[in-house]
Design a protein with these regions (language model features):
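Boundary at the C-terminal end of the N-terminal hydrophobic targeting segment
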Residues: 19-22
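Catalytic and substrate-binding clefts that recognize carbohydrates or anionic sugar/phosphate headgroups
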Residues: 80-285
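A low-complexity, Ser/Thr/Gly/Pro-enriched, surface-exposed linker/loop concept
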Residues: 39-86, 122-127
């Protein structure tokens, strides 16, 4: 009987992580009921998805061929124990808590780059608390809910937002710990007051004369960046509501994002454009 018990325990831990070697994709069943998917794109680019559902929603950015998906394989190692899973490349290591899904990132020398990245469901009080702050700030900017996004069947244009965030039951937050003195840049042409965004709340949704060309990408002075892979309305609270936390507020109950790392900020920008594509340089006579 004991042998059968130990065999079942071993099978449980072996089945908690499935890796597709060629694509370098890791499917992780978290103990809190969420499903996580980690894709190693390069030595320094990781795509991470989290959902409370049995399957992951297809990104419209992927459906329409906007983001890169044909990544070349890189050497990856994976360790699994009772508490956490480690996914490592030649340059960086992700440690994932098997219960909560909290992720910490360090380089191969052991220097911690991001102490904690964690997905919060709508049940977390922060979703309502931060949502109220967002709705108060942008109360005069309500628009049809995703009405201009071709292919978004979940929210037809006839549906109107009652609040900027929509229903609190269908939101989520990606919570990222911040270091003292860490600074952030990016976001495109959005609801910004400064070029440096630490301490600001940004609205990532195109609205005429308000947020013209938002880009849900942020780069840190610590040489890492994050791209929120969504066409849904979202908000970046970069240490405004909580001084030591970067909260990405999504108006959906799942997350799809890229973490990227480099030895310099230009390296991180290079990673970002590798994901989204690079603009073509026009000939001299075009200027």
């Amino acid at each position: 009987m004991k042998k059968i018990y130990y065999l079942l325990v071993c099978l449980f831990f072996l089945q908690s992580v499935f890796a597709a070697g060629e694509k370098q994709i890791f499917d992780i069943r978290l103990q809190n009921g969420l499903n996580m998917n980690v894709e190693v794109c390069t030595d320094g680019i990781f795509r991470i998805r989290v959902t409370p559902h049995s399957t992951f929603s297809e990104s419209l950015m992927q459906r329409y061929g906007i983001i890169k998906t044909d990544w070349s394989p890189v050497p990856v190692s994976q360790k699994d124990n009772k508490q956490q899973i480690e996914v490592s490349t030649g340059a960086y290591r992700l440690k994932i808590d098997k219960k909560t899904g909290a992720i910490s990132v360090s380089d191969r020398k052991g220097r911690v780059i991001i102490e904690k990245v964690i997905f919060l469901t709508s049940a977390d009080p922060l979703c309502t608390d931060l949502g109220e702050v967002i709705n108060a700030k942008y109360k005069d900017m309500k628009v049809p809910n995703n009405g201009t996004i071709i292919g978004d069947d979940k929210n037809p244009g006839s549906m109107k937002d009652q609040a900027e965030t929509g229903d609190y039951k269908n939101v989520s937050i990606l919570s990222i710990s911040l270091k003292d003195g860490e600074r952030f840049y990016g976001g495109g042409s959005t609801s910004r007051d400064h070029i440096q965004h630490r301490g600001e709340l940004l609205r990532m949704w195109t609205t005429y004369q308000h947020t013209e060309i938002p880009m849900p990408f942020m780069i840190s002075s610590e040489n890492w960046g994050i791209f929120n892979n969504t066409t849904r309305k979202n908000f970046f609270d970069i240490g405004s509501y909580q001084p030591d936390v970067f909260s990405i507020y999504n108006t959906t109950d799942e997350a799809d994002f890229y973490l990227m790392f480099g030895s310099s900020m230009p390296d991180v920008i290079n990673d970002y454009t590798a994901i989204t594509g690079r603009t073509y340089l026009l000939p001299k006579y075009a200027y």
